[in-house]
Amino acid sequence: MAATMATTMAVLNTKCLTLNTNKTTSTSPKPTSKPISLSPLGLSNSKLPMGLSPIITAPAIAGAVFATLGSVDPAFAVQQLADIAAEAGTSDNRGLALLLPIIPALGWVLFNILQPALNQINKMRNEKKAFIVGLGLSGLATSGLLLATPEAQAASEEIARGSDNRGTLLLLVVLPAIGWVLFNILQPALNQLNKMRSQ
């Protein structure tokens, strides 16, 4: 990149440097653009040919910058963007920051689920039929999950291959609520099955 910049500046030197003469080419005493010295760019008066002064205008600087940017290898720019993204990915804690306020809510939901779940397990132990029906329903649900369509399996494998775990974070947030709903549905479903058997 430095070589490209030096080449561009060498081309611009012949067009933009002015001769040291006392003649003024403009009738206005004030120049239209502020002249900029080349000394910050590493060019000094000793390196310039005799009779040239190191004054360059803003359009010439802009042309040099745009010419340099235009000749940079695109793969180099893509590599720099990838490096920046990789560095940002290792230090990005936004997902964790989003989970921190949700952790107390999840704890509260789990606390509220625990006692009814223990009561349900005790009832199911006392009633063997309910326990068998519960096993049957859970087996049916498990078999339904195992017989998922290949498209859904392919999509889940694609998600698993990616490094983006936002879906998992959202699932962790929603999973207790889904469990609570299923838990509340289970007892009425068991009651309905018992009524159907007794009739």
Swiss-Prot record:
> Lumenal topology: which positions?
86-94, 151-168
Keyword match Cell membrane? no
- Where is this protein localized, as stated in its record? Plastid, Chloroplast thylakoid membrane
Instruction: Give the keywords, sorted.
Output: Chloroplast, Manganese, Membrane, Photosynthesis, Photosystem II, Plastid, Repeat, Thylakoid, Transit peptide, Transmembrane, Transmembrane helix
State the source organism's domain of life: Eukaryota
Its Gene Ontology cellular component terms are: chloroplast thylakoid; chloroplast thylakoid membrane; photosystem II
Q: Which InterPro entries match?
A: PsbY_plant, PSII_PsbY
Stretches assigned to the Stromal side = 116-129, 190-199
| GO molecular function annotation | manganese ion binding
Q: Which residues form the propeptide?
A: 129-154
Any stretches that span the bilayer, and where are they?
95-115, 130-150, 169-189
Q: Name one GO biological process term.
A: cell redox homeostasis
Expression induction: Photocontrolled. Steady-state concentrations increase for the first 3 hours of illumination and then decline.
How is the protein disposed in the membrane? Multi-pass membrane protein
Q: Which HAMAP family match?
A: PSII_PsbY
Add the further remark from the entry: The central hydrophobic segment (residues 130-150) does not form a membrane-spanning region but could serve as a targeting signal for processing of the precursor in the thylakoid membrane.
Q: What is this protein called?
A: Photosystem II reaction center proteins PsbY, chloroplastic
Organism ancestry = Eukaryota, Viridiplantae, Streptophyta, Embryophyta, Tracheophyta
Which gene name belongs to this protein? PSBY
